Amino acid sequence: MNIVFSKEVESALKHKRPVVALESTIITHGMPYPKNVEMALNVENIIRKQGAVPATIAIINGIIHVGLENDEINELAKLKDVIKTSKRDFGYVLANKKNGGTTVSGTVLVAQKVGIPVFATGGIGGVHRGAEITFDISRDLDELSTNNVLVVCAGAKLILDLGLTLEYLETKGVEVLGYNSDKLPAFYSSSSEFNVTYNVHSASEVAAIMKAKWKFTNGGIILANPIPEQYGLEYEYILDNINKAIEQAKVEGISGKKTTPYLLSKVLELTEGKSLEANIQLVYNNAKVAAQVAVEYAKQK
């Protein structure tokens, strides 16, 4: 398979320095231009300041890129024909030399293949509301269960059924570690009514858990990192707006891949931009923690 590494990432992997994988759908589908470029470059710099190397993963003209130069991020952010790429899409996107923004599951898949054990994102996908009828369950959860990658996130997106998402993760053997929290963060909000599997208190503790688990068995780990309080939105406030967005999606017949981008856009409108700022801040926070964990894991190896 043709995978191109940036010089920075190639050197880091060769010398076993800490690397943090980053998805690209947050650039291609998650935020408007030029906010997406600004956020992506800031995330990379946050990771570098913590002593790790950022590796944004994307598909450009049918070639998987692990690590992007600044001009490549800028070009990717402006493209209109980018395919949201999870495991099922790789064959089509690669064979037809298309452009792809890798989802959480797509990024986990590539990270595992190239040996990057830490990945930072905003929030994971999960079990959609009404999944008992629609069977709409994100590929993220299955990919996490089979690949040795730690995903640092602010929990699952609040547009999902958080309770069922946790149940599914338990079935798949994926632990959800709360970073200095007993409760699952709810993306825009720092807490929810749901409990995490274990509360952990430091990057070194997380790194030790990664090492111990993967010495014994395979499978991903979620580090649920709450959005800093000063940037978080009230749980009931954001939940109310999400419910309104979900009802509107039903009216407009939105389904499948289009659901998440539609709902995030609608929530942005309903919260008058507050959700976008919260989204950016939680991604920054996750990048910082992921880099700290990657540094500790590199020491323990």
Swiss-Prot record:
Amino-acid positions noted as binding Mn(2+) in the UniProt annotation, renumbered to this chain: 136
SUPFAM superfamilies, sorted: Indigoidine synthase A-like
UniProt-recorded Gene Ontology molecular function terms: hydrolase activity, acting on glycosyl bonds; metal ion binding; pseudouridylate synthase activity
Gene Ontology CC entries for this record: cytoplasm
Cofactor note: Binds 1 Mn(2+) ion per subunit.
Cofactors demanded by this protein: Mn(2+)
Gene Ontology BP terms: nucleobase catabolic process
Pfam families per UniProt: Indigoidine_A (PF04227)
Binding site for substrate: 84, 104, 138-140
Family: Belongs to the pseudouridine-5'-phosphate glycosidase family.
Function comment: Catalyzes the reversible cleavage of pseudouridine 5'-phosphate (PsiMP) to ribose 5-phosphate and uracil. Functions biologically in the cleavage direction, as part of a pseudouridine degradation pathway.
Subunit structure, interactors included: Homotrimer.
Protein name: Pseudouridine-5'-phosphate glycosidase
